[in-house]
Each structure stands twice: as structure tokens, then as C-alpha cells.
């Protein structure tokens, strides 16, 4: 009933019928160095603020800026215009750094609230809704858990919220497996990537890697790679196979060195991993390269990158079931944390049966957001979380 009322009230705004629903201030600079943008409805403002946390931007992208390509849904819908058309104010930040920006990102989002209130002089919003995608989904979840005094609720989409260390291992495992099936094709190794490869990644992929994986003679090796790595794809749809391979290798190439620097050590560890699904698992496990994580990196991840599932304000999550970058298994892992903290009443998850990373339709995003609004307007009563299915849910990837 509350959701129906929320939908009705949001759609009542006359600005929703216009295509010029946003009035954006010139971008500014936050005290910590991040770039911020604030967009207000061209019509009446409902007094609420939506803050957007964007996804990963490679560390070597310059200058620091809000990623414009992440301000639109796959169908071209503008997020600021969609939010403003419903009467909400919209604010976004670049974060103060590119690359791995999780720890700084939480601080930048809190700082952005102060910028909205005091620097832009819009005053204190009635409610502040935090939304984020991909890396921004993790930042959103951490901020909701850690700063309920600032944010009234959050929508975290396609983020690595279940286990950040497992996310790192997902990319690392894919790289060591790729090197096993396609030896000497990629320069460097899974934990040390040459700068020349980073600088020329798109060209190197197009001229060297892509022809190798699309060669009909490589079909069996590609099949084994996908089976062993558990990378999502749609059987028989070549474009999804190539996308899954490209994305996993891209993150290894572009994110590894930056991640090691910011985590204070090397986080990938496959010493005890048993790989299965190849034509010869015994040979694979005997000969695949093994790496050990640095304890300093693991400690940093545990301290600043792992979610707890302890909620005191609502969190709605949204994820495609065949997400090739941030696998869907993050959602049941996070759900286990929520159950263990008796926070189930404050967590609503929406699964989208589709291939692709953050590949949502506007209606799916809007429904998830309206669920969040309804939970904030009328907070659900807490209840003890059922634990009988925890062993099965905790199995993970």
C-alpha cells in the first residue's frame, strides 16, 4: 500500500511530463578534491535529495571528472533528468580519485551532502537517498551501513557487496586460467601488469587477444576457460562470450597495479584453490600458476572494503543474474550477512534475469527506487531473521 502511494505521489509531479526537467549548476570542486554536480528540478522540488555513486573508472583516466557515460541507463535515459522529473534533487561526485575509490568514495559522498546543504545553499533535505552502481554499489552499501546519520536509505545496484576479496579473486582466477589456456598471449602476470599493456590495452586486445579467442581452433579452450572460471555468458551467443572474456581481462590489466598500491599489498590468493571443469583438471591444478596474498592487503580489505550486513536504515539491492563483471553470487552472500545481523526487514533485493553488468531497464530501476522510498517513508518493523537456509546460502561461488 505504501509503495502504491509513493508511486502515485511521485508520478503526480508535472515535471515528469517534460523533457527539460533538470537545471544543473556548473560543476564544482569538493573540499577533498572531487568534482561535484548538482541538478535541481525545473519545476517544484519535493525537498528530497538523491545522491548518485558512479562505478569504476580506470586510474589512468585524466582529468578527474564525473563519468558522463555512467549518467545514462542502457536505453539512453538520463539519470539526472529521470530523478529531477520526479521532483527530487540530484547530486553526483567524481570521487577524489579514479581507480579503486571505495574508501575515499564513502568520505566523498558524506562530503557531498555538506556541499549540497551549505555550499550550494539548498538547505537540509527532508530525506537523502543514496544510489550507486558497480563499485558505487559497494560504496553505497558501506555508506548506508556506516553513516545512517547522513543517509536515510540506499539503492545498491550490481555491486561487489557480498565479499570484496572474492571479487578480486574472481578477476585473478580468470587471468591465471586464461594464461593456462592461452600461454604467453598476455604480457606480465596476474599480479604485475606492464605499463605498456595498460596504456595500449584496447589496441592489444583487438589485434592480439580477440583474434585468438575467436579462432575456431580455440573454441574448446574458450569453453574450458568459461567452465572453470564460472564466468557468466549465454550459450551460443558469441557476443556474450567475448564480452565476458574482455571484461575480466580488462579489470586485471587496468585495475591490478592500482589496487595493489592502494591496498598496501597484493590481494590475490589461489594457493588453496581447486579448479574444476577442464578436460584435465589434474594437469590444470598441478601446472596453473599460484600466488599468495600479502597479509597487509587482506587486512586493508577487511577493515575498509567488506560489508557487514548490519542495517539501521533501508537498503534495496538490484542485480542481473548473469553479470559478467560482478557476479550475482554477491547477493546471496550479502543476504547471509543481513540475516546474521537480524536486518532482514531493512533489506529488499530485486533480481533481474538478464545478461550484462548493470544492464537494467528504466522501469526496473524506478521500481527499485520506489521500493526504497516506501521503506524510508514507512520503515518496516524489525523481525528475527530465519537461519535454516544459511548453510546453503553461505556456500557462495
What is each of the regions a protein language model found here?
Residues 47-57:
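Short beta-strand element of the alpha/beta-hydrolase
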Residues 346-361:
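Histidine-bearing beta->alpha loop at or near hydrolase active sites
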Residues 43-46, 112-134, 150:
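Gly/Ser-rich "nucleophile elbow"/oxyanion-hole loop immediately N-terminal to the catalytic nucleophile
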Residues 160-306:
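Accessory cap/linker subdomain of secreted extracellular hydrolases
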Residues 18-45, 283-292:
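N-terminal cap/lid segment of alpha/beta-hydrolase-fold proteins
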Residues 126-182:
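Primarily recognizes the serine-hydrolase "nucleophile elbow" in alpha/beta-hydrolase
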Residues 324-330:
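Conserved alpha/beta-hydrolase "acid-adjacent" motif
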Residues 317-319:
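Short beta-strand/loop motif that positions the catalytic acidic residue
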Amino acid at each position: 500500500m505504501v509503495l502504491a502511494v509513493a508511486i502515485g505521489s511521485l508520478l503526480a509531479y508535472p515535471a515528469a511530463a517534460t523533457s527539460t526537467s533538470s537545471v544543473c549548476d556548473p560543476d564544482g570542486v569538493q573540499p577533498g578534491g572531487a568534482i561535484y554536480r548538482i541538478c535541481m528540478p525545473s519545476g517544484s522540488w519535493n525537498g528530497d535529495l538523491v545522491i548518485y555513486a558512479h562505478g569504476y573508472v580506470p586510474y589512468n583516466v585524466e582529468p578527474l571528472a564525473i563519468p558522463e557515460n555512467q549518467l545514462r541507463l542502457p536505453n539512453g535515459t538520463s539519470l539526472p533528468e529521470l530523478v529531477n522529473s520526479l521532483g527530487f534533487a540530484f547530486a553526483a561526485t567524481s570521487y577524489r580519485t579514479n581507480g579503486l575509490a571505495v574508501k575515499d568514495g564513502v568520505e566523498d559522498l558524506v562530503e557531498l551532502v555538506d556541499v549540497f546543504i551549505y555550499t550550494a545553499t539548498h538547505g537540509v533535505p527532508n530525506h537523502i537517498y543514496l544510489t550507486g552502481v558497480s563499485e558505487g554499489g559497494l560504496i553505497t552499501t558501506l555508506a548506508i551501513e556506516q553513516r545512517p546519520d547522513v543517509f536515510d536509505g540506499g539503492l545498491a545496484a550490481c555491486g561487489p557487496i557480498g565479499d570484496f576479496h572474492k571479487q578480486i579473486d574472481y578477476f585473478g582466477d580468470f587471468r591465471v586460467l586464461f594464461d593456462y589456456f592461452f600461454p604467453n598471449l598476455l604480457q606480465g602476470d596476474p599480479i604485475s601488469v606492464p605499463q605498456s599493456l595498460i596504456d595500449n590495452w584496447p589496441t592489444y586486445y583487438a589485434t592480439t587477444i580477440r583474434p585468438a579467442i575467436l579462432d575456431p581452433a580455440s573454441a574448446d579452450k574458450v569453453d574450458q576457460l568459461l567452465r572453470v572460471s564460472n564466468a557468466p555468458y549465454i550459450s551460443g551467443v558469441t557476443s556474450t562470450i567475448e564480452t565476458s572474456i574482455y571484461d575480466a581481462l580488462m579489470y586485471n590489466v587496468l585495475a591490478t597495479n592500482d589496487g595493489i598500491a592502494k591496498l598496501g599489498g597484493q590481494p590475490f590468493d589461489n594457493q588453496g584453490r581447486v579448479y574444476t571443469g577442464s578436460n584435465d583438471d589434474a594437469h590444470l591444478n598441478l601446472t596453473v600458476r599460484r600466488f599468495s596474498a600479502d597479509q597487509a592487503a587482506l587486512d586493508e580489505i577487511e577493515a575498509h572494503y567488506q560489508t557487514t550486513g548490519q542495517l539501521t536504515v533501508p537498503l534495496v539491492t538490484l542485480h542481473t543474474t548473469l553479470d559478467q563483471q560482478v557476479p550475482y553470487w554477491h547477493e546471496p552472500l550479502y543476504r547471509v550477512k543481513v540475516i546474521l545481523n537480524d536486518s532482514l526487514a531493512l533489506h529488499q533485493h530485486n533480481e533481474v534475469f538478464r545478461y550484462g553488468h548493470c544492464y537494467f531497464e528504466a522501469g526496473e530501476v524506478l521500481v527499485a527506487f520506489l521500493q526504497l522510498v516506501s521503506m524510508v517513508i514507512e520503515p518496516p518493523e524489525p523481525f528475527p531473521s530465519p537461519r535454516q537456509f544459511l548453510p546453503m546460502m553461505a556456500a557462495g561461488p
